[in-house]
């Protein structure tokens, strides 16, 4: 039913992680089997994303981001056949990891996009929405799903030094395996004045959204995003953190699928550089490389890790002219 709240579906999710976390005696293979069962039971899975390279900024302030998150939550309530596993709202693009039939998942995006267009028009914003189109890719294995979840949850962290993967407030990553969920008490949207409810969800009819919860006028992410389901695809918090911080190869595969640009931070590119030059040239610092070795290392970072010209310049101290000649398609 379209009017069913997102929360009701989430409450019905069997939180496999919570079921197993008290049993430390489970072996690696047993934990992995439980994750596989969750994967098989709850699919199919999709990564919906938009192209930030073509789109102007949509969210330019905290108010804009909060509005976008409320509208996504409202869309989830109106499209309850889809389960939102995680998401990331960026300034000019979005990532949604979802489960459900493809057509239902695309309907969720269409509802969300429609609400964005109408709401920002009322706010007086002039935005060319034509590039804001959904691309959708299937996720066909448990490991691939883990990588796609992590990729989405890292997006703001890679783009801005102001955030860690678990501190960005407009994405599901801040709720994955975080203890703050047990220490806060969100308020039910339906307990607020009707005028306030309408203002938050940008809708006169607030009945479909009664399951949403609020913290300081910001929508409570677990009330519309099925964090418990997302957590169930990882063996435990440590395995989640390991993939989050130590899997550059996996990030590169996802970035290639999405035709994305930078997907590693400067620190991560630097670590990859040190590993490479130590293995290939038996040196410990980029400054010890010869000019020819720097060129080879630049090619390695560009083609293996999609490092930007700016990142390579900062790490290898190569001139912009040399880098533009090596990789002319990057600015």
Region roles according to the model:
Residues 93-95:
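Histidine-centered divalent metal-coordination motifs
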Residues 97-99:
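Short hydrophobic/aromatic beta-strand micro-patches
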